């Protein structure tokens, strides 16, 4: 093909084809290469195909999508206010907290009564339920999905020590609705977001400051970053098969990575993907707070404080955090042990 150099022809034909038609034939692309414009086109197409892309995030129309969060918690009064406020700022419509405290234990109403009165937080009575089954946490999750799927478009299943952070788009922070309303998630039944676990940052004791500000150093146990947590659609039409795993919830949903790319994963993906969002996991906090967590047990049962079980907990802490004599002494003093 003879290359036409006429500016008049360029303005009428090429420019019109470039900006008014999506399909650009190969001959025109060859011409554009001559003037260097094709490089920009290739970059734009790559960005569109590989990353979350919003034309103008500042002008996004207020979303009608409703996103809720479900969690189960026990002895978390020191941390529950920060958790609730964090997800309120992210735009979540409601949080369902399954209260797993002992019958005569603390009450979440003592610290978040205002959020309960406003309707943003709803407390579900699971008090004393711990220990009756081997899958208490999953019982709570399945009850939440069954009971409230008609009130939300999506439900996130996170723990109190897990904080979702959504990556900005074009320099603009997104709410959870704005994130999930993006076209890259249209085909997703579940969005799986990787952990990024944090260490004790060489702190020893509880401090009444936000967890997200106190702990900045990453965990030594990098393999744990492969764990994911799920946000699941509520209008799934096919049968949902229970996974009996808090990182998966259901084993037969169409999973996506945090940037919307399809990938069928259940509860673990390594290396982690942080392109769309990340869950910052404050798993141990300080050694003194960790010891309180060990005493508390999990949703299923209280750990027997025998030497074998305590040994497991001791070694896990120092697999995640730097080992120092002072931390070892605190653990031994609290549990009357003699670990080295």
Q: Which positions does each model-derived feature cover?
A:
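Short, acidic, metal-binding catalytic loop of nucleotide-sugar glycosyltransferases
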Residues: 85-94
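Short hydrophobic alpha-helical runs that function as membrane-insertion/retention elements
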Residues: 94-99, 124
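Catalytic-site signature of metal-activated, phosphate-bearing donor transferases
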Residues: 4-49, 137-142, 166-340
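Conserved short acidic donor-positioning loop in nucleotide-sugar-dependent glycosyltransferases
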Residues: 100-103, 163
């Amino acid at each position: 093909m003879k290359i036409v150099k006429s500016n008049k022809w360029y303005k009428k034909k090429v420019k019109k084809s470039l900006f008014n038609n999506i399909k650009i034939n190969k001959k025109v692309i060859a011409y554009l290469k001559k003037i260097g414009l094709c490089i920009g086109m290739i970059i734009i197409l790559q960005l569109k195909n590989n990353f979350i892309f919003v034309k103008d995030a500042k002008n996004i129309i207020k979303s009608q999508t409703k996103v809720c969060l479900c969690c189960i918690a026990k002895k978390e009064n020191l941390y529950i206010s920060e958790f609730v406020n964090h997800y309120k700022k992210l735009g979540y419509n409601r949080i369902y907290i399954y209260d797993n405290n002992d019958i005569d234990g603390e009450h979440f109403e003592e610290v978040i009564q205002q959020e309960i009165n406003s309707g943003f937080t709803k407390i579900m009575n699971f008090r004393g339920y711990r220990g009756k089954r081997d899958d208490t946490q999953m019982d709570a999750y399945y009850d939440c999905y069954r009971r409230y799927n008609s009130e939300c478009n999506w439900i996130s299943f996170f723990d109190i020590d897990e904080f979702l952070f959504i990556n900005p788009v074009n320099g603009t922070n997104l709410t959870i609705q704005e994130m999930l309303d993006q076209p890259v998630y249209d085909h997703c039944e579940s969005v799986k977001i990787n952990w990024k676990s944090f260490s004790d940052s060489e702190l020893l004791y509880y401090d009444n400051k936000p967890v997200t500000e106190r702990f900045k150093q990453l965990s030594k146990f990098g393999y744990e970053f492969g764990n994911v947590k799920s946000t699941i659609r509520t209008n799934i039409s096919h049968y949902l098969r229970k996974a009996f795993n808090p990182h998966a919830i259901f084993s037969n949903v169409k999973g996506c990575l945090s940037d919307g790319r399809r990938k069928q994963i259940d509860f673990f993906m390594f290396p982690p993907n942080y392109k769309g969002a990340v869950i910052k996991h404050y798993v141990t906090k300080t050694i003194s707070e960790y010891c309180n967590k060990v005493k508390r047990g999990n949703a299923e049962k209280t750990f027997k404080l025998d030497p074998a079980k305590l040994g497991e907990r001791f070694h896990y802490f120092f697999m995640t955090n730097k080992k120092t004599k002072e931390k070892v002494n605190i653990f031994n003093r609290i549990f009357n042990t003699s670990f080295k």
